[in-house]
């Protein structure tokens, strides 16, 4: 038997639907009825319908009403009539909206919205009224669909935050309609055909179809779960469609969100051999469920012809003309492909130093940093976004006072560099004096003069050895000093931090003390977003020779590649993960570690130096986002001991899972080249962190035998963009506000804290209202479990005194926090890094 629905379509008749509807009517009246009696009523309804032809939905519902009243169930029949009327009203508003837009297929989307968002505050009647206020004569169907989405966006408030999910569904529907028309117009059907088309147009890397068969692509297409689009907020989906999916050269999106996730998974699983389709599925599920986000360059560039997947690079600038310009050239090439940069200037001679014996000839680091600044502005990724670079200088460098005023608004503009991000490398001695004797003298010196006079580079040492040599230099009258007090430097640092948000802080002794690969090198600085801490070494010129090849004169320059650091990043979306489920977390971390390891081998490198370092150390940086989201969902206040205990446990679990996954990967694919003698191999890594439990001791023994696949594992990036994609809070930061309006291209875009509700409301305390000591203590607890560093911001208000800000720096240093990113004053807007947005 078939029944004709209101849209005219005939479908199989399902009598259980009548049973369920009547049961709901009885339940709604608080009337108990047994299954036997209900089945008798159903049988009577069916008997009376037997002669009905054709059978329609309205005819069935009329018969249910009549049968209920015949049996004396008048109140239930009345409730059923009211229920029908309510459903009819819901259908009418859906029909009206769909008809106004001119898209009949929209009705099903609206029906799902009514089913999933049942609270009165999400009534489609409100949407209809707002939408109709935007409609104007002569609008196209696409313009009306856009107006409908805009209406849902504007209905988003702190009291009705789920409108951002409704807006996302409407945006996704209109996008999918346009996308289907685009492919229909190109005469392309299945996924393989679309990938072939994109490849032929130079929009998709030909390596994907070269590695996968037609049958494998068809299998991958079956992995797609379009319903996961419903996980997007409007902000996340809008960002993804504008910046992450593949677009034609006329900026028309040609890839759905789920196809984007699948394309990334296909790329990252390419080298997995016969088992690759299993890993395609795991990578796709991890990404499409928004449990893990890859860094912005990986999300944007995986599957494309120029697949530069790394976020950040770090270079050690040599103290020579050739070396400095080589570093500038390296930065330009990195910036061209969307990478951010960290540059260590601690080896470059200070202003007034000698050049080839000529006194006072050197111009100092500021002149070179201004060239870096201009390069960042000039190399702007096809006009999309200017380059981004952090420049690091040691706290004892003679050019430090001028360096600390690079971005301030007062002083000589010829000594400014407003488009770079300055950062200072602090030894323990500096903070110890700031804490114990802030009026103590502090001596600024030129690294070139020290090397010339003493025969060693002071910046090549750390800890007690650095202190011993620093005092040796201070007491050597042959070395010129620029003597100030610690207080003078602290004042300059804090004044700049409050005014500009910078300099970033790099605690060099804390970093090197916990470096698991200290046996092969030293860490001089961090990257653009202060989460990377890996061994560094400058590129060295060896020789320049002239050869004749095939009758042509060829100039060959030989260089020693040094250690040019590369950051391959991803983030666990803690707000979207069951962090208490150890098995689930271990599986998720294992999948993410494997994906990051594959990035190393599948990456397109803008520089050979980067490729060589990355393949030698195989360093990765798995971090987190959704930290505040995670706490709020569990009813944990930021300013509480419960927060501190919880974060300690969660990050120990993440670290354990990461080390366990990495050593298993080493057994399968081989250990990194410099494993022998590392803290991993000797067990010092585990001892330094106090990992003494039975399971940690067992894991340490396994690591010593099997090795580690990657030299560095964990690094917490800011995730400013990718956290929006996954609908969670950024990095380890507290939220800025529960709800606010962001101005974007002339319109106001609502931003809502993740899963904001009456249950989470009181656990979302705004960043600037939080006692920052709690944030610092939490960072110290996390740092124990993170072998690299974390992008940790300080949030201050205008009420903070300089002494209070200094106290936070000192607390962070004492807690073992390796780096501090921005100092975000409430009155200050600072630019987020997009490269490290994992």
Regions found by a protein language model. Give the residues of each.
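Core nucleic-acid recognition elements
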Residues: 9, 32-262, 278-284
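Alpha-helix capping and helix-loop boundary segments enriched in small/acidic/polar residues
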Residues: 6-13, 33-36, 101, 252-255, ...
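Terminal amphipathic helices with adjacent charged low-complexity linkers/tails
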Residues: 79-87, 93, 163-195, 426, ...
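Short, surface-exposed, low-complexity cationic segments
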Residues: 14-32, 106-120, 262-269, 730-735
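Catalytic alpha/beta core of large soluble enzyme barrels
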Residues: 213-225, 229-238, 530-534, 596-601, ...
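Conserved, charged catalytic cores of large soluble enzymes
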Residues: 180-274, 357-371, 383-387, 392-527, ...
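Function-dense linear segments that define catalytic or interfacial modules
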Residues: 246, 252, 261-276, 280, ...
């Amino acid at each position: 038997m078939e029944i004709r629905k209101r849209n005219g379509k005939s479908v199989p008749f399902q009598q259980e639907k009548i049973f369920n509807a009547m049961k709901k009517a009885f339940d709604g009246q608080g009337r108990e009825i047994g299954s036997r009696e209900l089945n008798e009523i159903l049988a009577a309804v069916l008997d009376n319908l037997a002669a009905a032809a054709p059978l329609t939905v309205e005819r069935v519902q009329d018969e249910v009403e009549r049968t209920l009243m015949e049996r004396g169930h008048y109140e239930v029949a009345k409730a059923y009539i009211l229920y029908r009327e309510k459903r009819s009203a819901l259908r009418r508003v859906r029909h009206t909206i769909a008809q106004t837009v001119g898209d009949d297929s929209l009705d099903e989307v609206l029906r799902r919205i009514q089913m999933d968002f049942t609270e009165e505050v999400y009534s489609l009647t409100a949407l209809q009224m707002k939408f109709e206020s935007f409609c104007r004569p002569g609008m196209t169907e696409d313009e009306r669909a856009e107006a409908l989405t805009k209406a849902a966006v504007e209905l988003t408030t702190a009291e009705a935050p789920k409108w951002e999910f409704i807006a996302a569904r409407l945006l996704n529907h209109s996008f999918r309609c346009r996308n289907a028309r685009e492919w229909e117009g190109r005469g392309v059907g299945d996924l393989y055909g679309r990938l072939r088309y994109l490849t032929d147009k130079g929009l998709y890397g030909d390596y994907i179809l070269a590695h996968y068969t037609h049958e494998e692509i068809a299998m991958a297409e079956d992995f797609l779960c379009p319903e996961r689009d419903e996980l997007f907020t409007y902000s996340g989906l809008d960002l993804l469609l504008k910046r992450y999916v593949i677009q034609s050269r006329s900026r028309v999106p040609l890839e759905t969100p789920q196809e984007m996730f699948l394309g990334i998974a296909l790329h990252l699983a390419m080298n997995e051999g016969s088992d690759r389709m299993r890993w395609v599925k795991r990578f796709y599920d991890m990404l499409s469920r928004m449990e893990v986000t890859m860094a912005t360059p990986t999300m944007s560039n995986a599957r494309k012809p120029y697949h530069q997947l790394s976020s950040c690079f770090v270079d050690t600038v040599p103290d020579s003309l050739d070396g400095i310009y080589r570093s500038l050239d390296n930065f330009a090439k990195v910036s061209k492909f969307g990478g951010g940069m960290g540059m260590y200037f601690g080896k470059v001679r200070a202003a007034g130093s000698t050049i080839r014996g000529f006194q006072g000839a050197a111009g100092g680091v500021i002149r070179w940093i201004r060239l870096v600044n201009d390069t960042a502005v000039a190399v702007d990724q096809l006009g999309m976004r200017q380059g981004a670079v952090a420049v690091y200088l040691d706290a004892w460098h003679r050019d430090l006072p001028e360096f600390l005023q690079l971005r301030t608004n007062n002083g000589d503009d010829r000594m400014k560099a407003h488009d770079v991000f300055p950062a200072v490398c602090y030894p323990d001695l500096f903070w110890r004096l700031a804490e114990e004797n802030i009026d103590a003298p502090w001596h600024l010196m030129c690294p070139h003069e020290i090397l010339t006079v003493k025969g060693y580079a002071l910046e090549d040492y750390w800890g007690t050895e650095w202190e011993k040599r620093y005092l040796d230099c201070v007491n050597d009258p042959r070395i010129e000093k620029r003597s100030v007090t610690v207080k003078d430097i602290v004042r300059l640092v804090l004044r700049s931090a409050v005014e500009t948000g910078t300099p970033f802080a790099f605690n060099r002794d804390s970093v090197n003390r916990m470096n698991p690969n200290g046996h092969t090198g030293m860490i001089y600085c961090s990257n653009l977003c202060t989460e990377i801490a890996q061994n560094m070494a400058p590129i060295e010129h060896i020789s320049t020779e002239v050869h004749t090849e095939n009758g042509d004169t060829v100039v060959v320059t030989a260089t020693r590649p040094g250690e040019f650091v590369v950051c391959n990043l991803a983030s666990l979306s803690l707000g979207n993960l069951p962090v208490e489920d150890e098995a689930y977390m271990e599986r998720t971390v294992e999948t993410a570690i494997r994906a990051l390891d594959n990035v190393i081998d599948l990456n397109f490198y803008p520089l050979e130096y980067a490729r060589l370092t990355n393949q030698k150390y195989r360093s990765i940086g798995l971090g987190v986002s959704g930290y505040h989201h995670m706490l709020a969902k569990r009813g944990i206040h930021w300013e509480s001991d419960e927060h501190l205990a919880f974060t300690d446990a969660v990050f120990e679990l993440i670290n354990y899972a990461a080390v366990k996954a990495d050593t298993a990967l080493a057994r399968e694919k081989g250990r990194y080249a410099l494993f022998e003698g590392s803290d991993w191999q000797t067990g010092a890594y585990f001892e330094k962190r106090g990992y003494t439990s039975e399971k940690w001791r067992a894991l340490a023994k396994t690591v010593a035998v099997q090795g580690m696949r990657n030299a560095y594992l964990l690094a917490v990036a800011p995730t400013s963009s990718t956290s929006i994609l996954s609908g969670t809070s950024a990095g380890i930061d507290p939220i800025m506000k529960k709800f606010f309006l962001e101005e974007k291209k002339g319109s106001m875009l609502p931003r809502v804290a993740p899963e904001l509700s009456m249950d989470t409301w009181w656990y979302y305390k705004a960043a600037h209202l939080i006692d920052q000591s709690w944030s610092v203590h939490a960072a110290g607890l996390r740092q124990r479990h993170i072998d690299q560093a974390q992008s940790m911001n300080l949030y201050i208000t205008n009420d903070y005194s300089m002494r209070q800000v200094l106290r936070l720096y000192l607390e962070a240093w004492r807690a073992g926090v390796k780096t501090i990113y921005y100092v975000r004053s409430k009155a200050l807007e600072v630019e987020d890094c997009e490269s490290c947005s994992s």
